[in-house]
Amino acid sequence: MKKKMIFGMIIILITIAIIYITYTINNPKIAVLCYHNIGTQEEKKNVPQEQEWTIDIENFEEQLKMLKENNFKTLTLEEFGNWKQGKIKLPYKSVLITFDDGFLSNYKYAFQLLKKYDMHATVFLIGNYMQEKNEKWNGDLKTYISKETLQKAKEEYNNIEFASHSYALHEPGILKTKSYEELLKDEKDFKEKVIQTQVYCYPFGAYNDDMIKSLKESNYKMAFIFGPTKKEYRKASKKDDNYCIPRLNVSYGMKPSKLLIRLMLPF
C-alpha cells in the first residue's frame, strides 16, 4: 500500500513537472527587475523616506551572486526588444535589470558591482533632477546623477544603459494636468537636454492614452510600467503591449533565495 502511494506521488510530481516545462516553453516570459536606490545602513538612517526604496549594498551583491551562480543572463535593451518582437530567442533564465530615478548611489555602488559580475542594467533618468555637475559623494541618498557623471558613467561602464523617466513629469498626479502638446514637449526636452533614447519608464507608473500617443509620436519603441496593482507586478511576455511592459519590484530586504524562487515562477 505504501509503495503504491509513493509511486502515485512520483507520477503526480512528474506530471506537474511536465506541465510546468510545457507551459514555460510555450509561454516564454522575462522578468524585468525594478530597483531604485542602493546604500549602506547608515546612509538609510539619514534619509528615512528612502528606506523602503533602498537596497543594502550587501543584499544587492548577494542577489547578483545568486543570478551569476544560477546562470542567469542579464539583458541589454536591444536584446529585450528583439526578443519581444520575436526576432531572437533567449534562455529561460534571462532578466532585464532596471533602476528608476537615476540616483547617484547607482553610480557609487551598483555600477561597479554589476561590472564585477559582468551584468547589464538600464537606468531611467529624470531630466530636471540632474545638475550639470555633482559634488563628491556625501552619503545623501536623495542625490541624483549629474550630466557630468552621466558622461563619466557612459565612458567607464559599457554594461550600463540610460533611458527616460521623463524630463519634468516626476510628480504624483501631474499627468492629469498635462496636455498632449505638453507631453510632447517633455519628451523633446529629455532627448535634447539629456540623451537620445527610444525607451521610456512612466513616472510613478502613471500613463494614459495621450501619454502613449505622445511616446509613439516621439519615436519611443518601448515603455515600462510600475504597478499600480499586484497583477501588474509580473514577468513580461511577447504579447504585452510595447507601451505597457510590466516589471517586478525588488523590495527592500528581499533575500536572494526569495528572488530566485520568484524568477523561477512562470508568471
What are these regions (language model features)?
Residues N106-Y107, Q131-N134, H170-G173, N208-M211:
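Extracytoplasmic/secreted cell-surface and envelope-processing proteins
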Residues K147-L150, K154-K185:
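Histidine/lysine/aspartate-rich catalytic loop segments that bind and position anionic ligands
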Residues K4-F7, Y20-I97, G173-F267:
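C-terminal active-site subregion of NodB/CE4 polysaccharide deacetylases
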Residues T122-F124, E161-A163, C201, K221-F224:
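Structural detector of well-ordered beta-strand residues that form the stable sheet scaffold
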Residues I30, P48-K152, N159:
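Active-site beta->alpha N-cap acidic-glycine motif
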Residues C34-I38, L125-N128, S164-L169:
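Short loop/turn segments at strand-loop or loop-helix junctions that form parts
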Residues M9-A17:
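Core hydrophobic alpha-helical transmembrane segments of single-pass membrane proteins
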Residues G102, Y167, P203-A206:
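Catalytic metal-binding/acid-base residues of hydrolase active sites
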